[in-house]
Regions:
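Deployable pore-forming modules of oligomeric membrane-permeabilizing proteins
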Residues: 1-95, 124
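Surface-exposed charge patches in extracellular/virion surface proteins
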Residues: 2, 25, 40, 74, ...
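Hydrophobic residues positioned within well-ordered beta-strands of beta-sheet architectures
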Residues: 29, 34, 47-51, 150-154, ...
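Residues in intrinsically disordered, low-complexity segments of regulatory proteins
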Residues: 34, 46, 112, 134-136, ...
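Short, surface-exposed beta-strand/loop "edge" segments at domain boundaries and coil↔beta transitions
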Residues: 55-67, 74-78, 106, 142-148, ...
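Membrane-insertion modules used to breach or fuse lipid bilayers
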Residues: 83-131, 163, 167-193
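Amphipathic, membrane-active segments
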Residues: 124-168
């Protein structure tokens, strides 16, 4: 699955100002969703949706937990894959190798590096019987006014021309004293014709 927002076929965005129960502004949240058409064969369409979600509390507030939902309840759709965003304490190893040959001489080299995540815990709610996936992000040390950007994605198959995806962001903002305010939700269903 592509995990970069480049060369996309379609995109959409939504955002909202977040208010407390007295109507005072306490931050913003929003996203841009990118669609990539992967394969069209007969009535089947395979596409990726990558969402760049931003949770931005104002100074005096912080994010203690954020979630991003991607999927659809429409018939004729199936989630094939979902991004595995690593969690606190988990590590990812990246490798690269190069080789070359010219006139019987061969050379090359390789390297690898490991990165261990220590900024947040990520819980994945991936029920394989449904066509939705939810990532829940809990910052290890949520700072006052710190914004968080998360980039989950899914690969879906649709057996129709109109390909649907719902994007939902949820986040209760928290005061610096640890008092959790309203659960704030931003949700919209989108489609592309493919």
């Amino acid at each position: 699955m592509r995990m970069q927002a480049d060369d996309f076929d379609a995109h959409a965005n939504d955002s909202a100002v977040v208010y407390d129960t007295q109507g005072n502004r306490i931050g913003t949240m929003g996203y841009t969703a990118y669609w990539y058409k992967i394969l069209k064969s007969g009535s089947n369409r395979i596409f990726d949706v990558i969402t760049v979600a931003t949770f931005a509390p104002d100074f005096g507030y912080k994010c203690a937990k954020m979630s991003v939902y991607l999927g659809t309840n429409k018939a004729n759709h199936e989630v094939l894959e979902a991004a595995n965003i690593v969690s606190n304490g988990e590590s990812t190893t990246h490798s690269i190798s190069l080789s070359a040959q010219k006139k019987g001489i061969t050379g090359g080299g390789s390297t690898s590096w490991t990165y261990t995540v220590d900024a947040q815990t990520v819980t994945k709610q991936f029920d394989m019987q449904t066509n939705d996936r939810t990532w829940i992000f809990k910052p290890k040390n949520a700072g006052n006014g710190d914004a968080w950007i998360e980039e989950p994605g899914i690969r879906m198959c649709a057996t129709q021309e109109r390909c649907y995806t719902t994007v939902t962001l949820s986040c209760p903002f928290v005061t610096i004293l640890g008092i959790e305010l309203n659960e704030n939700t931003l949700s919209r269903a989108w489609y592309i014709d493919y």
